[in-house]
Swiss-Prot record:
Cellular localization per UniProt: Periplasm
Organism annotation: Stutzerimonas stutzeri (strain A1501)
Entry cofactors: [4Fe-4S] cluster; Mo-bis(molybdopterin guanine dinucleotide)
Record function comment: Catalytic subunit of the periplasmic nitrate reductase complex NapAB. Receives electrons from NapB and catalyzes the reduction of nitrate to nitrite.
Record note on quaternary structure: Component of the periplasmic nitrate reductase NapAB complex composed of NapA and NapB.
Keywords: 4Fe-4S, Electron transport, Iron, Iron-sulfur, Metal-binding, Molybdenum, Nitrate assimilation, Oxidoreductase, Periplasm, Signal, Transport
Protein name listed in UniProt: Periplasmic nitrate reductase
Source organism, top-level taxon: Bacteria
HAMAP family in the record: Nitrate_reduct_NapA
InterPro entries with a match to the protein in the record: Asp_de-COase-like_dom_sf (IPR009010), CT_Nitrate-R-NapA-like (IPR041957), MoPterin_dinucl-bd_dom (IPR006657), Mopterin_OxRdtase (IPR006656), Mopterin_OxRdtase_4Fe-4S_dom (IPR006963), MopterinOxRdtase_cofactor_BS (IPR027467), Periplasm_NO3_reductase_lsu (IPR010051), Prok_molybdopt-oxidoreductase (IPR050123)
């Protein structure tokens, strides 16, 4: 039997994924049913439920149940391949502890913060929520309520939540868990280009001559893209791969230039590369003269800790962290002079010859370079700077916005781009890159939403880490989370998160599908529908918007987050939540509910249920009497059309395997800012960074600054946290798939063998990781897939029984407010010897 190259790649990827997960190939076969005629299954397309790659899958249903999935061969992203998590998508929905009814803490038949969870009806759940919301609004105004959402919200769920909070309740205290993963990338894009999200696409992989991974373990975190990268590397001998990290991981297996650097010194390396480009005469002077300008960013900006922290008191520019002053090219050249090869090698610990080889990849005009990064860059107290500095390198050489030359920020959630960033569910944002602080943007939003002037507040709300602090301090009284598990995923759990959730003055609601750590710490649990139990849309890392139909119904009384948000809006009259002065501008709203004003407003409700594709259910449309998803999407699309965020018409996406915005005349855009690809670039200009008023990108002069916390005599180790291939984020879905759980049942403490010997422990010994904030126990691993250098330990955060985030520090980037989960100081105590 002969195989085509694609068939071989698919078979090989399946073999690798199965081997990594510790299972035989045969065990994957039950999830790879492909002959519909022989099985009497109904197959439909959907994007994968996991990471931001946006793989397409085919979903098989029978008797109102998902029974199988396989990679979609028609999907451009993955071309029929799935990673090991994707192969088990059909099993994530049917854990034995699936939530199927609302649960309220009760004692003696009524709510009690110290009571036990008891089943209640949806009406009872909304009754207590209504009571708590109205009391909080009366006592503290809009600032007293908050919402924490997700990059796993569908586009219309995030859009509905944004409307309900920012317009309905007039509170900007809504933030997504993407604050923990993508905020630094978003601010980096906005500062450099004036627009968010990558300019390139996945086709860059097949066109590049070199790949540089900055703090990204693509082999495990984006394995399908890694398959494409590996194919490019192995099929083209001239292609090089450079991998940089603070510890060795599986992506190093393909590295031509492997580099382990000291934590935080990626900033030094980035400036060295820029300096090398200039000193070696490799600057594309024509490009930078025409398309860039230079600026010096504010420095000594602090670490996003509480204002009373000594580090914040020393920070001179914490209040103006996101500011800069214009400088010239020669000023930038002078700024970079201290960042020599010798200095970079000394600070980073990377051998000089490897640093120079890396710099030469960027400097060589004949080499097309694709830079990839994710959490190693973004979860960083200077993450925005790191993003700006990688753009500096691509701009200095002109290696940008063309096939193969691409700085590419990878995303970790299926709609961190499509929902958190594009919809604007951050506490400071509005749709299509607009901001609550901009009067023009607020006016545009109020016009599209048909609301009176002054409805939207101008002050940004509390960001994710600050929400936890405000709950603890009693400022936030009511808090609703959806599709997120912050009690496990957030930093400094014991000191800053748990106290706020269990504060007697607060009321916390968690909408989820399983009893997560967060759900168990809440006061009210709402059972949610998941994935294909509802009609949905995600936006992936390459700006690709993808739709799916509802394919099955949710179990029991579980309801979609969209239904929960919209149904709850019926509980409030406008005159109950808006001040009289605002209501006087729209007297016709008096006695109307937030549902009437936000969702039954003549445009969201303008599409009838007759427009739902034949053969598909839609619970929300049936409940509200109109095609809610289509109405929300078409209203949302008004923000971007004509403003370089164009989306196609709703029905187009149900036909296509996704389209990359801007979509003009139903034609997607692969490379932004480049003439011939991007319809917004003016003829004859070649390249235009039109997000900024002068249509130029900014090259930033930004220095190295030390981390918030470093090892010392008492706490001599670095701690870095992250993920593993088999589990996704907090493991609330993947831990319920037997094959994945058995493959990796526990979070291990990855340690250098020499450090283990010094502690008199060995592989399998139990140790305690202790920081100034908390502690966690785990088994030592000295021979596993992750190989830290001496002085650093690595622990994944998927394990709900081993909460490593009890140990982490809640320091954030002062600009993006994104948490640094990669660097804090710990000590290791021996519990038992294996």
């Amino acid at each position: 039997m002969s195989l085509t190259r694609r068939q071989f790649a698919k078979a090989n990827a399946a073999a690798i994924a199965a081997t990594v997960a510790g299972m035989p190939i045969a065990s994957t076969a039950s999830n790879l049913v492909t002959e519909a005629d022989a099985t009497n299954l109904k197959w439909d397309k959907a994007p994968c439920r996991f990471c931001g790659t946006g793989c397409g899958v085919m979903v098989a249903t029978r008797e109102n149940r998902v029974v199988a999935t396989h990679g979609d061969v028609k999907a451009d992203v993955n071309r029929g391949i799935n990673c090991v998590k994707g192969y088990f998508l059909s099993k994530i929905m049917y854990g034995t502890d699936r939530l199927t009814q609302p649960l309220l803490r009760m004692k003696d038949g009524k709510f009690d913060k110290q009571g036990e969870f008891q089943p209640v009806t949806w009406d009872q759940a909304f009754d207590i929520m209504e009571e708590k919301y109205k009391a909080a609004l009366k006592a503290g105004g809009p600032e007293a309520i908050g919402m924490f959402g997700s990059g796993q919200w569908t586009i219309w769920e995030g859009y509905a939540a944004n409307k309900l909070m920012k317009a309905g309740f007039r509170s900007n205290n809504i933030d997504p868990n993407a604050r923990h993963c993508m905020a630094s990338a978003a601010f980096g894009f906005m500062r450099t280009f004036g627009m968010d999200e990558p300019m390139g696409c996945y086709e860059d992989i097949e066109a590049a001559d070199a790949f540089v991974l900055w703090g990204s373990n693509m082999a495990e975190m984006h394995p399908v893209l890694w398959t494409r990268l590996t194919d490019r590397r192995l099929s083209a001998p001239h292609v090089k791969v450079a991998v940089m990290s603070t510890f060795e991981h599986r992506s190093f297996e393909l590295a031509d230039i492997p580099m382990i650097f000291n934590p935080q010194t990626d900033l030094v390396i980035l400036n060295y590369i820029a300096n090398h480009i200039i000193q070696s005469g490799a600057v594309n002077k024509e490009f930078i003269d025409k398309h860039t300008r230079f600026a010096k960013g504010a420095t000594n900006i602090g670490y996003g800790l509480r204002p009373t922290d000594p580090l914040e008191l020393k920070a001179e520019n914490a209040a103006v962290a996101n500011t800069w002053t214009d400088i010239g090219y020669e000023d930038y050249v002078e700024f970079l002079k201290p960042y020599t090869l010798e200095h970079a090698a000394k600070e980073s610990g990377v051998p000089a010859e490897r640093l120079k080889a890396l710099a030469e990849l960027y400097a060589d005009p004949k080499v097309k370079v694709m830079s990839f990064w994710t959490m190693g860059f973004n979860q960083h107290t200077r993450g925005v700077w790191a993003n700006n500095m990688i753009y500096n390198i691509h701009l200095l050489t002109g290696k940008i916005s063309e096939p193969g030359n691409s700085p590419f920020s990878l995303t970790g959630q299926p709609s961190a781009c499509g929902t958190a960033r594009e919809v604007g569910t951050f506490s400071h944002r509005l749709p299509a890159d607009m901001a609550v602080t901009n009067p023009k943007h607020r006016a545009i939003t109020e016009k599209i939403w048909k609301l009176p002037e002054g409805t939207i507040q101008e002050k940004p709300g509390f960001h994710a880490v600050d929400q936890s602090r405000k709950l603890k301090d009693g400022v936030l009284k009511v808090y609703w989370t959806q599709v997120t598990n912050n009690m496990q995923a957030g930093p400094n759990v014991m000191q800053e998160i748990l106290p706020g959730w269990r504060n007697p003055e607060t009321f916390v609601i968690v909408s989820d599908v399983y009893p997560t750590v967060s759900a168990q710490a809440a006061d009210l649990i709402l059972p949610s529908a998941m994935w294909v139990e509802k009609e949905g849309a995600y936006g992936n890392a390459e700006r690709r918007t993808q739709f799916w139909h509802q394919l099955v119904t949710a179990p029991g009384e579980a309801r979609s987050d969209l239904w929960q948000l919209v149904e709850f809006s019926k509980r409030f009259r406008v005159d109950e939540v808006w001040p009289a002065e605002l209501l006087s501008k729209a007297p016709e709203f008096k006695d109307k509910t937030l549902f009437d004003v936000l969702f039954k407003n003549g445009q969201v409700d303008r599409f009838s249920n007759d427009e739902i594709a034949e053969g598909y259910a839609n619970y929300e449309a049936e409940a509200f009497g109109f095609y809610l998803q289509k109405g929300l999407f078409e209203e949302y699309a008004e923000f971007g059309r004509g403003h370089a965020h164009d989306l196609a018409a709703f029905d187009v996406y149900h036909r296509e395997r996704g389209l990359r915005w801007p979509v003009v005349d139903e034609k997607e855009t692969q490379w932004r800012y480049r003439e011939g690809y991007d319809p917004y670039v003016e003829a004859g200009s070649g390249v235009q960074f039109y997000g900024n008023a002068d249509k130029k990108a900014i090259i930033f002069a930004l220095p190295y600054e030390v981390p918030a916390e470093v090892p010392d005599e008492e706490y001599p180790f670095w701690l870095s946290t992250g993920r593993v291939l088999e589990h996704w984020h907090t493991g609330s879905m993947t831990q319920r798939v037997d094959e994945l759980h058995k493959a990796v049942p526990d979070a291990l403490v990855y340690m250098h063998p020499e450090d283990a010997r010094k502690l008199n422990v060995r592989r399998g010994s139990v140790v305690k990781i202790v920081s100034r904030r908390g502690e966690m126990q785990g088994r030592v691993e000295t021979r596993g897939r992750n190989k830290p250098p001496m002085g650093l330990v690595y622990v994944p955060f998927f394990d709900a029984n081993k909460l490593i985030n009890k140990v982490t520090l809640d320091a954030t980037d002062p600009i993006s407010k994104q948490t640094d989960f990669k660097k804090c100081a710990v000590k290791i105590e021996v519990v038992s010897i294996a």
